[in-house]
């Protein structure tokens, strides 16, 4: 079963008639499925067209490449019938207009857009033109006809041939005037109506043009059309007249050029062999008859056509190279602009980050400065208070003098109060005990001083009121010092250990000095 197809299996196992019935049923099922698929495709296309959406592609919307791995040949050969294959094979893609059009009715611009994008061989291009039945007139839009005829006076066959040829050319001209490009819709050829006289246009040679010399090498070689003549006995005598007519005629300068590239053909013709070189060869034509002349003329036309194609090909290569350079420069410019924008974004980000850090540092510096200023203010206040206390003590000493007490108590007080500073406790945890001791000693001294002052008031009643006031002031100052001791304790917690200890030691020294000054006995 694996080596046989389904059709062969049914035919061998069931026979011909069951095979016919089964395949008829399968075909009806397939037709129904195709009708459903076609209706859905039509409905989707109508929806896309109604809402101005992009029309879905027939090949992209298939799920074969997702569900099953398919060979690309399946889509282009097996899935398309013979009739549509013929239609598709006659179409070509225009890279300019992004359209599929009939290749036999495409203009030069649309044709060259696909014929020279990847193919660089001249022979391939020539074969393509031959396949498409394109003559030289259809490839060159601005051509003008220059007939090379070999007439003989009094020849009726030539006159009949000329009349038939005129009728044929007129009909072809009318047809070509109406022919338009299948892609862009432009007229493929616009031939100007040229008035023709009786016999002078055919038999007579035109006078040389005084404006353009023969050595200027500005011939429009693409405007030559060769007319075949029948080979008979009368035509054998036309050799001399035809050569004279060709040598005496001066080619006319034709303006315009390649409309697709916008460059005149005369510019490309300057780099190619000239008609003057080939005209010298025609003087050496053999005297064997008209057949050799026909062959020589045909070879000249072929060579000229080949040279025109080569020049066009070189121009197209140059333009393609120019386009590549432009695209490369555009890509480089885009990359440079992207790099510049990225660098600018990075620079802006770095600047923003630097500004943020700078603001943070400024705020931190301001906060630290405020803290330092507040601490300096507190220290200044404490110093001022200490100075005020010292000034008050000095005033008291100057006004009342030193208080007297017993010798033993004074010595004991001095021994206690004149201890060195290094003997005082340093640990911050014992500051409260020191302050309490100082408070008790100060109260004791105040009490002793009060007793001493009362005794002195008994002796000196005149100074009683003054001493009471001074004692009350000293008591208030001691209470203030006690309240400030708590504040100093809080400050010691905030400050560093070394600074707090130093301040407390200094305060304790000042308090001891104050007490010693207050209770110091007079030695005089």
From Swiss-Prot:
* Pfam families, sorted: Zein-binding
Q: Listed GO molecular functions?
A: myosin XI tail binding
Kindly list the cysteine pairs connected by disulfide bridges.
none
Q: Which PROSITE patterns match?
A: GTD_BINDING
Keyword Transferase applies: no
Q: Does the keyword Transmembrane apply?
A: yes
Where does it localize? Membrane
Question: Coiled-coil regions in this chain?
Answer: 462-490
| Membrane-spanning parts | 20-40
Give the membrane topology. Single-pass membrane protein
Supply the name of the protein: Probable myosin-binding protein 5
């Amino acid at each position: 079963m694996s080596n046989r197809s389904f059709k062969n299996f049914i035919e061998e196992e069931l026979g011909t008639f069951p095979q016919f019935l089964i395949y008829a049923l399968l075909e009806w099922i397939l037709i129904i499925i195709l009708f459903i698929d076609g209706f859905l495709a039509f409905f989707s296309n109508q929806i896309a067209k109604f809402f101005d959406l992009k029309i879905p592609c027939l090949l992209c919307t298939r799920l074969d490449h997702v569900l099953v791995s398919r060979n690309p040949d399946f889509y282009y050969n097996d899935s398309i019938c013979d009739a549509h294959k013929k239609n598709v094979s006659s179409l070509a893609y225009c890279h300019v207009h992004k359209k599929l059009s009939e290749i036999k009715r495409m203009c030069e611009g649309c044709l060259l857009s696909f014929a020279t994008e990847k193919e660089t061989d001249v022979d391939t291009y020539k074969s393509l033109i031959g396949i498409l039945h394109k003559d030289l007139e259809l490839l060159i839009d601005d051509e003008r006809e220059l007939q090379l005829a070999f007439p003989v006076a009094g020849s009726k066959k030539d006159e009949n041939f000329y009349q038939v040829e005129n009728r044929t050319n007129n009909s072809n001209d009318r047809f070509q005037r109406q022919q338009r490009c299948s892609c862009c819709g432009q007229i493929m050829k616009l031939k100007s109506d040229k008035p023709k006289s009786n016999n002078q246009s055919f038999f007579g040679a035109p006078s040389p043009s005084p404006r353009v010399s023969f050595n200027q090498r500005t011939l429009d070689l693409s405007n030559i059309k060769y007319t075949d003549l029948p080979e008979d006995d009368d035509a054998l005598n036309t050799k001399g007249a035809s050569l004279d007519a060709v040598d005496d005629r001066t080619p006319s300068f034709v303006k315009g050029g390649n409309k697709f590239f916008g460059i005149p053909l005369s510019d490309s013709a300057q780099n190619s062999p000239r008609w003057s070189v080939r005209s010298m060869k025609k003087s050496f034509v053999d005297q064997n008859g008209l057949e050799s002349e026909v062959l020589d003329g045909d070879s000249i036309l072929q060579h000229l056509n080949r040279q025109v194609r080569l020049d066009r090909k070189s121009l197209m290569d140059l333009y393609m190279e120019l386009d590549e350079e432009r695209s490369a420069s555009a890509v480089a410019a885009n990359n440079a602009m992207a790099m510049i924008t990225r660098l600018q974004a990075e620079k802006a980000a770095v600047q923003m980050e630097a500004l943020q850090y700078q603001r943070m540092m400024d705020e931190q510096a301001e906060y630290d400065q405020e803290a330092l200023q507040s601490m300096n203010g507190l220290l200044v206040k404490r110093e001022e208070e200490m100075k005020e206390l010292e000034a008050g003590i000095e005033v008291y000493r100057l006004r009342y003098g030193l208080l007297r007490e017993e010798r033993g108590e004074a010595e004991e007080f001095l021994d206690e109060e004149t201890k060195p500073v290094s003997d005082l406790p340093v640990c911050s945890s014992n500051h409260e005990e020191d302050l309490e001791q100082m408070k008790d000693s100060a109260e004791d001294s105040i009490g002793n001083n009060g007793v001493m002052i009362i005794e002195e008031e008994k002796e000196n009643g005149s100074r009683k009121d003054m001493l009471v006031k001074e004692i009350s002031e000293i008591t208030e100052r001691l209470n203030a010092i006690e309240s400030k001791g708590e504040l100093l304790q809080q400050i010691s917690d905030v400050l560093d250990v070394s600074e707090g200890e130093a301040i407390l030691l200094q305060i304790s020294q000042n308090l001891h000095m104050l007490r010693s000054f207050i209770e110091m006995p007079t030695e005089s």
